[in-house]
Amino acid sequence: MDIIEKIKDTREAKGLSRYKLSQLTGIHESTLKRYEDRAIKKISFENLLKICEALEINIKEII
């Protein structure tokens, strides 16, 4: 399982929509969708940290 899959699985397991995650992170919802759809191949470290914080997970859990 790769980083994007882990993020999506965790987001869904916590019952968060992409819209809500967008609100929590400040990352535009369309950017989150493009990450999950793999339209954007690489996620910035800064955005990865924001997502992990919003999902309340340690970055070590997904990398």
Predicted regions: what they are:
Residues 27-42:
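Recognition helix of helix-turn-helix/homeodomain-like DNA-binding domains
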Residues 46-61:
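DNA major-groove recognition helix of helix-turn-helix/homeodomain DNA-binding modules
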Residues 5, 29, 44-48:
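Short alpha-helical elements of helix-turn-helix
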Residues 7, 21, 32-35, 62:
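Conserved hydrophobic/aromatic packing and binding residues within compact polymer-binding modules
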Residues 5-24:
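Short basic helix-loop element that most often maps to the first helix and adjoining turn
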Residues 1-2:
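A detector for short, charged/polar N-terminal pre-domain segments
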Residues 8-12, 36, 58:
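A broad helix-preferring feature
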